[in-house]
């Protein structure tokens, strides 16, 4: 056992003495030690109940002959951090989480790992840390929140509230209506109810084979969720000492490609691109961003879930057959021979899964589009690529317009709220990339204001920052190189004409090579003055979005 390093032989008497202080007895030292990585946090709706959820898992581990050791990691609620400088800390928190998992598991030489994430950066952070440790690992997330219900029975979610703010500003709704939406949108525990970043990543855990069936879709705090937790706990005990189930044997290049096929088919959050690039690097099978369009070109988009289709949420996906039904529908594009934590291949796992509601999950022959719900655009405005959630486009997939430039998210929010943005504009928000922010803020506030003000089909937005999974509209993020590295987005001027063609994967500004060269000569950027010591460290080490915004020493 890996844990013998801390518990076997006379020389480890001091170590055992410390472990006995936690309640261990003689027989416990013969059992596998299981790390239970929790992310309980009282301020996060997707996490405030995870202390009780973890207890279910630990009790089941004990019943099955192993010793659980729970430890916690931090978590940032992106919705609460949204629209102010708290969002600077969201993406950097992914690295803290990865480092924390690696530190706890390697310092204490635990034999296996069960991870309990739920929201946004916590899921990829735990995956990245687990890949560094490389022991048998299972992911069991807290589960999605149920959709809220409005006065007329319409489905609501967090994005409904953000868009309602924009509607209130232009007097489409009154203060009471705004308050009613606020009070109804998030009815209880769980990760926000649409195919936003958290639920996108939780479903991709199923596609990669590191989580059990239903991980991404069974609602939080339900009997079925608790049953899934117990099943995951039993399984980690079964595989704890089996090297075949080390996480790097599960997450390989095939698993990463499987995840991206599923992501394209269901129109997941654009943040998944950032995280899967980072995860693939940690797994030793680095995905090139250019490969993603090849996957997109062959993958039909068969499921639209909020925000792309506001009335459909994760509970509807589960009732329609879940992620297995989506995978079975696109099985010809998957590596069906890849191993999963259950011991089955992916093909064995999804065999016989049926679509139960074709309004939620379409058949391939009735796909929303023949290409995937995410796309990478290239051109003189993004030589290293940029990302769009094509599934969330409200108007045309082809757009040309005049740039209106803002040098921060705060400037953009002020400009949009002040009525500066008009139909036909391309809103440019720059110096918000991984280095420029630093921290690559999400832009849900400005995009929601645009949609809420009725401009979603008539305005495009591009940024070197990123978007919430709740964003919809013609919104292009992760522009690389970013403005802070002298990228073209930092050289744009108000009035420049920008051409966007999603179906041809292109984004360009109408400037000659000579004009671009001249602007590059004139470019000066001294960098933002960052007060935070942690964010200064992050700014120094982080790479750009085309590399997954990973840290490189």
Swiss-Prot record:
Gene label? ilvD
What's the name of the protein? Dihydroxy-acid dehydratase
Q: Which family does it belong to?
A: Belongs to the IlvD/Edd family.
Listed Pfam families: ILV_EDD_C (PF24877), ILVD_EDD_N (PF00920)
Record-level Gene Ontology MF annotations? 2 iron, 2 sulfur cluster binding; dihydroxy-acid dehydratase activity; magnesium ion binding
Q: Which GO terms describe its biological process?
A: isoleucine biosynthetic process; L-valine biosynthetic process
- HAMAP family referenced in this protein's UniProt entry, alphabetically: IlvD (MF_00012)
Which of this chain's residues are annotated to bind Mg(2+)?
78, 120-121, 442
EC code(s) of this entry: 4.2.1.9
Q: Which reaction does it catalyse?
A: (2R)-2,3-dihydroxy-3-methylbutanoate = 3-methyl-2-oxobutanoate + H2O; (2R,3R)-2,3-dihydroxy-3-methylpentanoate = (S)-3-methyl-2-oxopentanoate + H2O
Gene3D superfamilies the record matches: IlvD/EDD C-terminal domain-like (3.50.30.80)
In which domain of life is the source organism classified?
Bacteria
Q: Binding positions for [2Fe-2S] cluster?
A: 119, 192
């Amino acid at each position: 056992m890996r844990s013998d390093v801390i518990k076997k032989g006379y020389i480890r008497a001091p170590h055992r003495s410390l472990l006995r202080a936690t309640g261990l007895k003689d027989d416990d030292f013969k059992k596998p030690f299981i790390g239970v990585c929790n992310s309980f946090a009282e301020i996060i709706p997707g996490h405030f109940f995870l202390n009780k959820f973890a207890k279910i898992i630990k009790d089941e581990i004990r019943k099955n002959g192993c010793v659980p050791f729970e430890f916690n990691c931090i978590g940032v609620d992106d919705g609460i951090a949204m629209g102010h400088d708290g969002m600077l800390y969201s993406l950097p928190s992914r690295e803290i989480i990865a480092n924390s998992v690696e530190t706890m598991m390697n310092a204490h030489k635990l034999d296996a790992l069960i991870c309990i994430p739920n929201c946004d950066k916590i899921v990829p952070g735990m995956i990245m840390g687990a890949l560094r440790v490389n022991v048998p690992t299972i992911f069991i997330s807290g589960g999605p929140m149920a959709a809220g219900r409005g006065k007329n029975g319409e489905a609501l979610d967090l994005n409904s509230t953000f868009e309602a703010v924009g509607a209130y500003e232009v007097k489409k709704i009154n203060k009471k209506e705004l308050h009613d939406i606020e009070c109804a949108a998030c009815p209880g525990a769980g990760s926000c109810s649409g195919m936003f970043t958290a639920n996108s990543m939780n479903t991709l855990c199923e596609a990669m084979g590191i989580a059990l069936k239903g991980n991404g879709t069974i609602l939080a705090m339900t009997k079925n969720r608790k049953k899934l937790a117990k099943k995951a706990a039993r399984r980690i005990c079964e595989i704890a000492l089996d090297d075949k189930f080390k996480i790097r044997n599960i997450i390989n290049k095939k698993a990463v490609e499987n995840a991206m096929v599923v992501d394209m088919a269901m129109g997941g959050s654009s943040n998944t691109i950032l995280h899967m690039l980072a995860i693939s690097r940690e797994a030793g099978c680095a995905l090139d961003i250019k490969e993603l369009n090849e996957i997109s070109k062959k993958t039909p988009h068969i499921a639209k879930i909020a925000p792309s289709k506001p009335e459909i949420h994760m509970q509807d996906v589960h009732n329609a057959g879940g992620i297995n039904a989506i995978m079975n529908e696109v099985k010809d594009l998957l590596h069906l021979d890849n191993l999963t934590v259950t011991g089955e291949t992916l093909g064995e796992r999804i065999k016989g899964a049926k679509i139960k509601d074709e309004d939620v999950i379409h058949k391939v022959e009735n796909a929303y589009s023949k290409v995937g719900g995410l796309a990478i655009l290239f051109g003189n405005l993004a030589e290293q690529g940029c990302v769009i959630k094509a599934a969330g486009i409200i108007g045309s997939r082809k757009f040309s317009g005049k740039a209106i430039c803002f040098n921060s998210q705060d400037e953009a929010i002020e400009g949009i709220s002040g009525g500066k943005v008009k139909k036909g504009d391309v809103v440019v928000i720059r110096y918000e990339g991984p280095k420029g922010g630093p921290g690559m803020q999400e832009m849900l506030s400005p995009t929601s204001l645009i949609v809420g003000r009725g401009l979603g089909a008539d305005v495009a937005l591009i940024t070197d920052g990123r978007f919430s999974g709740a964003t919809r509209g013609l919104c292009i993020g992760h522009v690389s190189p970013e403005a802070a590295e002298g990228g073209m987005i930092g050289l744009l001027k108000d009035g420049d004409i920008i051409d966007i063609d999603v179906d041809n994967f292109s984004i360009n500004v109408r400037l000659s090579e000579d004009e671009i060269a001249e602007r590059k000569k004139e470019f000066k950027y001294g960098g933002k003055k960052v007060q935070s010591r942690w964010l200064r460290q992050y700014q120094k080490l982080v790479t750009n979005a085309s590399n997954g915004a990973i840290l490189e020493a």
